[in-house]
Amino acid sequence: MGSGTGEKGRKGDEGPAKEITLSPYWMGASEVTYDEYDAFFKDESFTRNQPAPDAITRPSPPYIDLTLGMGKQGGFPANSMSQYGALMYCKWLYKKTGIFYRLPTEAEWEYACRAGTKTAYPFANDTTGLSKYAWYKNNSENKYHKTALKLPNAWGLYDMLGNVAEWTMDQYDESYFSKPEAKDPLIIPTTRHPRTLKGGNYSDDATALRSANRIKSNPDWNRRDPQIPRSRWWNADAPFIGFRIVRPVKKPSEEEINHFFSAYLDNY
């Protein structure tokens, strides 16, 4: 993962490129949609009150339209998402299905995006065919679009580039590639910002959509609080953020799963 020194648009935090080993996992073919997230939002078997330990709460309704009129039902991606909101959706899925889902690590995301390639984009080193695969600045009309309308990568994953940027599990670290971990690398967050997103979004230029590009989360993404007290669920000023989920092939123990969600959610 990472980019070579000669890659056009390369930034200093993308290398040196290195080989990693990942445990097997499945990844969602598309970004989680508004309809899918709305099922969580409307699930009345869970409360919107302050949770007890280990409990599930539903998102509190924002006071503004976080889609900015770009679209909701019918396959549009869930947007304006915080990492907390994305992980609570994963926790809800686990409680509903007994299957453990989570966000991908930065390494898992990039590996899946590349789909076996070492080029700047999953299809080539240049941007000639980018519009066939991605919604971005040149073709999006400055809005996100329904998922899976563009071509997938070689592994059948849609919208890995553009549309909405996607959360990973990692704390952003400029020196990520100098870390020694080569097996299942993960930088566990210790602060809310910056954390790492990948993929670029509908308003980005082509260089931001490269497989190796890294995005730092920013507290300015929630300057206008959609809730009082400060929302953990939404990023009111970042309609370009969504997520997709993964499922490890080897299911962790219930104790490990509970520890995972507690570590990420309790002090967010």
Task: Kindly give the residue locations of the regions a language model identified.
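Signature tryptophan residues that serve as conserved aromatic anchors
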Residues: 92, 109, 135, 155, ...
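Core domains of carbohydrate- and sulfate-ester-processing enzymes
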Residues: 48-64, 132, 198-211
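Surface-exposed recognition segments
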Residues: 10-18, 117, 141-143, 164-268
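Short, well-ordered junction/capping motifs at the entry into regular secondary structure
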Residues: 134-161, 189-191
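Glycine/small-residue-rich pyrophosphate-binding loop that anchors the diphosphate of NDP-sugar donors
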Residues: 16, 28, 77, 146, ...
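Active-site rim elements
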Residues: 74-77, 147-148, 152, 228-234
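Chymotrypsin/trypsin-fold serine protease catalytic domain
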Residues: 118-144
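Active-site microenvironments of metalloenzymes and redox enzymes
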Residues: 3-10, 21-124, 169-173, 177, ...
